[in-house]
Amino acid sequence: MPNTYDFFKKGTICTNTFSCSEWTFPSLATYESGLDTLGHMMFHNTIDGELPQSVPTLTEYIKGKGYFTSKLDGDWRCIYSYGFARGCDQYVYQIQSMGARAEQEIINAIEHIEAFKDTDQYLWMTVGDLHDIADGYDLSLAVQKNLTLDELEYEDAGKTSVKQNYSWGKSQRYKKTIQYFDMLFGILYNYIERNYKDNEIVISLFADHGQGYLVPNDKHFLSKERTKVAFMFRGSNVDEKISDEIISTADYLPIMCKLCDIQVDYEKINGRLPLSFGGEKERKYAITESIHPGDKYCAVANADDYEIYFDNQALTDEEGRFELKDYKVYGYYKDGTNIEDKALLDKYEKIFMERIAEHVIYD
């Protein structure tokens, strides 16, 4: 993504950021609330949830600072009834396929910024076209014309967009769609640079999760291809650097509030301000977890030199609770070798057990 790199290399690009969840509904709730999945419990795929009223949302924090707040969205997993309209002065929602595709939303964003140019404004824009690959939808003609027949070959969409097996074809479609995205976003980047100085803006770009069809068949469900995400910032008070600090997506709210000079109540959230953005210390690990009714709970702790997994064998119920049954704690170093250090594994077993204690069904 040359346009994206050229734009954000003048800010901070974070290369070790991990999503708290592996799919959109809980992941976007984390970005807006600063809570991890077990904190906000918006995890159920068929029962709607709502952002907890006990914590301010990012939009509410920014609204309280005096900004005109807006949301342009085509993603049905972060709609107003889920609490994402809290703090919004203007909320524009359209089903992605009916008017909120990338090429439309980017122009909508420019139009919005122009319309409210005399105000201090905050704009959240969601572009979800990459989801079309997992969902099996037709891609833009501009993408299709760059794909071979082999890369366009029909494949089963899978049980859900989350539970995707590795696919070479989908991987190629993913890469070509990202290249198309970068071309489109270049229009927005150019507009911003022509109209604003860096001390007048704070721009962030992030992804909610990775992709299952990028995970090799011999790797864990929560491997980095599914959990590591794009995460970058540019503008006022943003240093120019590449950061390899371990960061959780729960840290997004603290980062944005720091850049906007807003005080955060850290006692109520899981997010922390990374050292790269002025925090006091680095995270030693970031946890991603998968919790679905009818599925087995699993989690991974990603650290600098290793990744450690927790796999439970009992199924999760409709309330997000489960019995502990034949669970395993194991991990791998960066070079792929097994972790045999019992003290290290015991340490993370305790960390995982403390996290899930309130969700375990005890005899």
Label the model's feature ranges:
Residues M1-D363:
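Catalytic domains that recognize anionic headgroups
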